[in-house]
């Protein structure tokens, strides 16, 4: 099948793949055609970020699909990076991870605390990767406009 990959800015390209190909393979093909290192690529399908280790079929990507490509600045972490190093180096979250480390150290042995923290970071990063653009838009709207709280209608079922 042929996929179209469209950078936010720049010329799109087509890549020939099977539905069983991994996202990382698509990134390598795009790298060859657009001269953008795979480590700087973030592929999106219908607003959802694609994880390198998943297959195209995991996202129900079929023939003639269009993928959006976001190019990260050089040096920014890739989605396949190890969780602890990227999360600890992240300026916005380093305080949170340091605080978590302190709390875990009070309740676990150093080895167990490290394992628990590593798993929490992996789960956190996986959750972030699964956010769609719609999810992010809703979250931003709630944060920017808290006075317009949405009424909980779950009790109406």
From Swiss-Prot:
SMART domains: UBQ. The keyword Disulfide bond does not apply. Residues 1-76 form the Ubiquitin-like domain. One of its GO terms (cellular component) is cytosol. Pfam families: Tugs (PF17840), ubiquitin (PF00240). Its main location: cytoplasm. One of its GO terms (biological process) is post-translational protein targeting to endoplasmic reticulum membrane. It is found in: Cytoplasm, Cytosol; Nucleus. CDD domains: Ubl_UBL4A_like. GO terms for molecular function: protein-folding chaperone binding. Keywords: Cytoplasm, Nucleus, Transport. Component of the bag6/bat3 complex. As part of a cytosolic protein quality control complex, the bag6/bat3 complex, maintains misfolded and hydrophobic patches-containing proteins in a soluble state and participates in their proper delivery to the endoplasmic reticulum or alternatively can promote their sorting to the proteasome where they undergo degradation. The bag6/bat3 complex is involved in the post-translational delivery of tail-anchored/type II transmembrane proteins to the endoplasmic reticulum membrane. This is Ubiquitin-like protein 4A. It comes from Danio rerio.
């Amino acid at each position: 099948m042929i996929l179209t990959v469209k950078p936010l800015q720049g010329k799109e390209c087509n890549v020939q793949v099977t539905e069983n190909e991994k996202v990382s393979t698509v990134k390598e093909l795009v790298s060859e055609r657009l001269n953008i290192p795979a480590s700087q690529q973030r592929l999106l399908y219908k607003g959802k970020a694609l994880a390198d280790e998943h297959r195209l079929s995991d996202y129900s990507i079929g023939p003639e699909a269009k993928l959006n490509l976001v190019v990260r600045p050089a040096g920014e972490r890739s989605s396949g990076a190890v969780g602890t190093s990227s999360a600890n180096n992240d300026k916005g979250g380093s305080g949170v991870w340091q605080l978590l480390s302190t709390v875990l150290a009070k309740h676990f042995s150093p080895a167990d605390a490290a394992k628990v923290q590593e798993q929490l970071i992996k789960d956190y990063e996986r959750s972030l990767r699964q956010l769609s653009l719609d999810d992010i838009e809703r979250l931003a709207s709630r944060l920017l406009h808290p006075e317009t709280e949405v009424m909980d209608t779950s009790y109406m079922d």
